[in-house]
Amino acid sequence: TGPFIGRLLDRYGPKWILVSAAVITGLCMIGLKYTSLSWQLITIFAVMGLVGMSGPGSLATSVPPTKWFVKNRGKALAYSSAGISAGAVVFVPLTQVFIDKYTWQESWVILAFIGMGIIVPLSLLFLVREPEDMGLLPDGEKTSKILESGKEGIHLSGIEKSWTAREAIRTFPMWTLTAAFSILSLGILTLALHRIPAFMDRGLDPSLVSLATAFDAVCAGVGSFTAGMLVRKIPAKIIGSSAFLMLAVASVMSIYAYDFWLMFWSMALFGLGIGTNMFNQNYIWAEYFGRTNLGSIRGIVMPINLFIGGLGAPAAGYVVDMTGSYDPAWWTGVALMLVAAVLFVVSNNPGEPQAEPIVESPYNVDRISNSGTDYNQGGIV
């Protein structure tokens, strides 16, 4: 559903997409209370996968900040992506509290109503496709200053040129980035889902492993937030490359983690890498291909990322069953991360579209100047 949702996002904005995703996911979570057959469980998770916030539905939360901000895009993504880690820090222990007090079946229902109760009203009240829809400008720029400078002046400074999805798929960077993120995801998932049981099999205290897991989520938030704050001073490619290397080093540390401290710091570094990469994926597509058709472009890429990455966990599990060791799968994951890093490094910014470029500064002057309204107030909602 990624390409479909991406096009809807560019055309209509995130409001109803996010509301629909929240309601459908919430109803599926309630349905989990009543499942008793395997086909019911598979069906519910398939539906959640089609619209869920960790899949195509996540476009509705990652694309809008890139449309509302250009100069301050990194900072906006820093704040928005940090919310993912904050949610993990809050809801993982809260879920355990619900399970201990009400059983896991009732916990699904409680979490469903909490999610819908937060997401639906906030989406209806505050989400708008892009600032021009409200007569505003990205980054809170003043309309009068832009109009006084004239279109030519805008074309020479502060310009962001946007590619269409059809133009983007003809470029080399589109596919090297797609390959880099897909292979990285494959490498990550050979490790991420198996490291917890592996650490416990090595005799590490489960309570200490859970502590390190929680700290992993904290470090992911720190990584995404720090990357967003630094991206105006450090090129995005360097920040992104550091994420690949952090994940590879953390994976090597995990292979040798037979004591608490090495396990703890491997989880911390892994979290930093995950958070930095999470920011990088949200930022780099807008930097390379502009904001106008970002939903459509990322909608094409996301199913590929999810499909290839999804092979990692079952493949690693199969290797463990065959060999009795996690090491072969994990070393393969490290190699995949390094290959992905090379692909990312060779993915250069494609520059301007060659055929019929869509030229867009941070300021869509035609839509604002012809609106017949004085929008000197400027700003971001």
Outline where the language-model segments fall.
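Helix-to-loop junctions at the C-terminal end of transmembrane segments
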Residues: 1-13, 223-235, 320-321
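C-terminal ends and interior cores of transmembrane alpha-helices
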Residues: 23-36, 246-258
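Hydrophobic core of transmembrane alpha-helices in multi-pass small-molecule transporters
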Residues: 28, 39-56, 182, 262-276
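Cytoplasmic helix-loop-helix junction between adjacent transmembrane helices
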Residues: 46-82, 290
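Helix-loop-helix hairpin linking two adjacent transmembrane segments in secondary transporters
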Residues: 80, 84-134
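Symmetry-related core transmembrane helices of the 12-TM Major Facilitator Superfamily/SLC fold
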Residues: 108-125, 328-346
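Extracytoplasmic gate region of multi-pass secondary transporters
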Residues: 166-224
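C-terminal transmembrane helical hairpin of 12-TM major facilitator-type secondary transporters
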Residues: 188, 204, 208, 213-284
